[in-house]
């Protein structure tokens, strides 16, 4: 495998949440809307809809996870179009799209894109990750 080149930050964050974590994601977004408002947000279907209902306008929605949304976000990761991924997942649940989830997580590792799977990690990334102007 080739050595990865340094990626230019684009100011894009992907947001994904399993059903049992959507309320946590919405609360996280509301608690950090001053910072998140400076980024272009990309979200899977229902997660994006719930975030948009809070009044944030800087969000692009993709399909819901089971309908290919996780794979769409994975494509953004592979193309270098996302700086970090916040995926609040339910680690105890089974999901019909588990292969897509595993692929997304693998792509984050391959392309060295920071991946937060819980609020604490997302908070650390958001506060300590520089955004190119």
Feature-to-residue mapping (PLM):
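SAM-dependent methyltransferases
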Residues: 1-14, 27, 33-38, 53-57, ...
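General beta-strand structural signal in soluble alpha/beta enzymes
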Residues: 42-44, 61-63, 87, 115-119
């Amino acid at each position: 495998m080739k050595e990865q080149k340094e990626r230019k930050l684009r100011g894009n964050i992907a947001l994904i949440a399993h059903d049992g974590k959507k309320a946590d994601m919405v609360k996280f977004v509301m608690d950090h809307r001053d910072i998140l408002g400076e980024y272009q947000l990309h979200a899977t279907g229902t997660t994006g809809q719930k975030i948009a209902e809070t009044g944030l306008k800087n969000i692009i929605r993709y399909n819901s996870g089971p309908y290919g949304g996780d794979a769409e976000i994975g494509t953004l990761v592979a193309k270098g179009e996302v700086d970090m991924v916040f995926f609040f997942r339910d680690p105890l649940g089974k999901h019909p799209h588990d292969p897509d989830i595993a692929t997304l997580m693998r792509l984050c590792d391959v392309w060295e894109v920071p991946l937060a799977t819980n609020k604490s990690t997302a908070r650390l990334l958001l506060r300590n990750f520089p955004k190119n102007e």
